Regions:
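Glycine-rich beta-strand-centered segment in the early N-terminal region that forms part
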Residues: 22-38, 46-92
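Short, conserved catalytic or interaction motifs in soluble domains
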Residues: 74, 110, 135
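Generic structural motif
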Residues: 67-69, 98, 124, 141
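Glycine/charged-rich beta-loop-alpha catalytic/anionic-binding loops adjacent to active sites
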Residues: 103-114
Length: 169
């Protein structure tokens, strides 16, 4: 099977082309994407070929996405066709259909849109940073940079009890 996908052929050369979609492997979930998200810093570095930040060309950018399970591999437990899922998986995001390891997929709760669920991986990244800092009630925190990860991190530091929480961009 084939689907449309954005493929970075080389630095500064992304193209919308047909890409192959193999059957999912034993521990993979095949997802039909409903929403993908551009993580500006990471994807700009990848597409522009920034040293030490770029996968080998060609590659499919995008790792923040949400959609519906189409098929599951033979060893997958807990997911079935029709499930709404969000995923954090490199080389899958900006394409119509992709295979994702079952450990990189989470169910989307009822009432959450695909567009909001696509932010799951960026929320996970910012929350991990806040947890590693082990913020305690009343500690002050400053965030340098207010991209989406910085904004989410500031929200999580506030919820963790940081005061004051200072945002600098």
């Amino acid at each position: 099977m084939k689907c449309k996908g954005i493929v970075a052929i080389g630095p500064g050369d992304p193209r919308l082309i047909d890409v192959d979609v193999p059957d999912p492997g034993p521990h993979e979930v095949q997802v039909k994407m409903a929403a993908t998200l551009v993580s500006a810093g990471t994807e700009r570095a990848w597409v522009n070929g920034i040293p030490n930040a770029t996968p080998a060309y060609p590659y499919i950018p995008g790792y923040c996405c949400a959609g519906e399970v189409v098929k599951t591999g033979s060893e997958v437990v807990g997911f079935e066709p029709g499930d709404r899922v969000a995923t954090f998986a490199v080389d899958v995001g900006h394409r119509e259909i992709g295979n994702v390891r079952d450990l990189e997929v989470v169910h989307i709760p009822e009432g959450v849109s695909y567009e909001h669920a696509a932010f799951t991986s960026l929320g996970q990244t910012s929350l991990q940073g806040v947890r590693k800092c082990k913020i305690e009630l009343g500690e002050s925190v400053a965030s340098l940079g207010l991209g989406i990860v910085g904004i989410l991190a500031m929200q999580f530091t506030h919820l963790a009890g940081a005061q004051p929480a200072i945002a600098l961009d």
